[in-house]
């Protein structure tokens, strides 16, 4: 990898559910309070990546998490940084290890020496979501949504709240990022 020409990201996906908007409501004792809820099975999948060096967060909505959308998100990151090599740290989801992702890496890295690869993917420790700073971003957004449940009258508004929580702070100073930084001194 050439110095100054590498971007490193932690990447993950998140499923936002209509039920994530649930909060608490006060009502008279021994009286049932009814709150209208539309389809409780509604969901939106988001892919996100945090730049290890700047803390900038990139968010994109997709229909679901699978190999196709994983590759679509990787291509999105490539378009943002066309002249840089990308290093992606992520969990061991099946669609991160097989199928379309493998085909994509073979295509973009074809004929290149390993140190010249355009995209390098590194798996985090298995069953250790606490290692991925993107999980902290998801938690922040999923905490924000029920804190504002009074305006979450539709799933569209739930999604808007989720995105607003992330976009209100597009640069994340996750303490976990520091443990992955390499000292240049």
Describe each PLM feature range.
Residues 1-185:
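Short functional hotspots at interaction and active-site rims
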